Amino acid sequence: MKTLYTIGHSTRTIEEFLELLKAHHIQEVVDVRTVPQSRRNPQFGQDQLQTALTQAGIAYTHQKNLGGLRHPSSDSINLGWQNLAFRGYADYMSTPEFQQGLQELEDRAVKKTVAIMCAEALWWRCHRSLTADALTVQGWQVLHIQSRKTAKPHELTSFLKIIDDKLTYPATGEYEP
């Protein structure tokens, strides 16, 4: 089965972060932060992170087209998300830009062991969870790195529906046959 990992850098030291990546044999980190910087944790700024990863023998790619910080559309069908940031990202997932980004990610992940990375440690509080839904529906096993020994398999969002081959997150009772 095709496998892809997710990880959040959180407040870890760069050494702790690299240790997690090595424990799961990650060969490439795909940064899915819209803005690849961190004021609170400067070790995860794009330049510093890329340098540390390169020194550890791990490739780095920034994929802004999979980044979060999206705003919901006025005609959003993803009303199941009360969190407007998640609703906005769910709306964005139906765009050609997202689909292209997802394909680029999949192309990388068939060649190397890849982890998508954002800042939030808890994947269910990050847009990585929605990206993981899209990948899981495409037949990928997505594992969320928690510790050196633990990577939790992704479970699809409970209110996810597939309508006309698109992932949607309708409010309860919407789009029911």
Explain the meaning of each model-derived region.
Residues 1-177:
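Residues lining hydrophobic/aromatic ligand-binding pockets adjacent to catalytic sites
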